[in-house]
UniProtKB/Swiss-Prot annotation:
Native organism taxonomy: Eukaryota, Metazoa, Chordata, Craniata, Vertebrata
Keyword Transmembrane assigned: yes
Organism: Bos taurus (Bovine)
Subcellular location field: Cell membrane
Membrane topology of this protein: Multi-pass membrane protein
Keywords on record: Cell membrane, Glycoprotein, Membrane, Transmembrane, Transmembrane helix
Gene: TSPAN8
Alphabetical list of PANTHER family matching this protein: TETRASPANIN (PTHR19282), TETRASPANIN-8 (PTHR19282:SF380)
One Pfam family here: Tetraspanin
Family: Belongs to the tetraspanin (TM4SF) family.
Name of the molecule in the record: Tetraspanin-8
Matching InterPro entries: Tetraspanin/Peripherin, Tetraspanin_animals, Tetraspanin_CS, Tetraspanin_EC2_sf
Length: 238
């Protein structure tokens, strides 16, 4: 009986290691969107009609499963375990189908997702001027974010802060009044631009990175299916 081809065995191991790394990247980027400051503290308080995080939640699940499958594939290849290879093949096929379906949905609903994001930001803009103690966490988080992004206010600039401006203006302050990106407001030199565009771009950029990785992995996954079938057949002939 013929043995398992060493070249295919090593290729399968390398493939699964790269596959595991890709899963780790997808998982980390998706979690950074879902659990980061923008996702957790800036977007979460607003109750938009559409859930902005459905695609992100799916990708967190996909990333975790890819890591498990990568580990399973490595072990199956090295130990020449037929059962592990079957599990790997079935799991990889399901992930591939899920990725394709999620990618199609995300692409066709791109404009609706952007509308939902914009609506959430508009809703949350009202929270900046609130005097309710329950909104202090959101206001503090946004104050730190606007300092990082070098902007002021969420939609309409500094006026979004209302009477709270005097309490949070320091993170809006601009280094120089002569700078074209700065303006005067209530006697303070602040950034002219609101944070609306910056937050939208940041969210969209991270989501694009994750989706690009997911689509790129689809081609690699097809190779993984072929490798696993060939390796499994050789194991049976051994």
């Amino acid at each position: 009986m013929a043995g398992v081809n060493v070249c295919i065995k090593c290729s399968m191991f390398i493939f699964n290691f790269v596959f595991w790394l890709c899963g780790a990247i997808i998982l980390s980027v998706a979690i950074s969107i879902r659990a980061g400051k923008i996702g957790q503290e800036i977007l979460a308080p607003g109750d938009a009609d559409l859930n902005l995080f459905i695609a992100v939640n799916i990708l967190i699940f996909v990333g975790a499963v890819i890591m498990i499958l990568g580990f399973l594939g490595c072990c199956g290849a090295m130990k020449e375990n037929q059962f592990m290879m079957i599990l790997f093949f079935v799991g990889l096929l399901m992930i591939l189908l899920l990725q394709v379906a999620a990618g199609i949905v995300a692409t066709t609903r791109k404009s609706k997702t952007e509308q939902a994001l914009n609506k959430t930001l508009l809703i949350n803009a009202r929270l900046l001027s609130s005097t309710d103690e329950n909104e202090r966490v959101f206001q503090k988080a946004f104050s730190e974010l606007q300092e990082e992004l070098k902007c002021c206010g969420l939609v309409n600039g500094a006026s979004d802060w209302g009477s709270n401006f005097q309490h949070y203006y320091r993170t809006c302050e601009c280094p120089s009044e002569s700078d074209s990106s700065c303006t005067k407001y209530s006697g303070k030199t602040i950034y002219k631009q609101s944070c609306f565009a910056s937050i939208s771009q940041m969210f969209s950029k991270r989501l694009f990175i994750v989706l690009a990785l997911a689509f790129g992995l689809a081609a690699i996954e097809v190779l993984g299916l072929i490798f696993s079938i060939v390796l499994y057949c050789q194991m049976r002939k051994k």
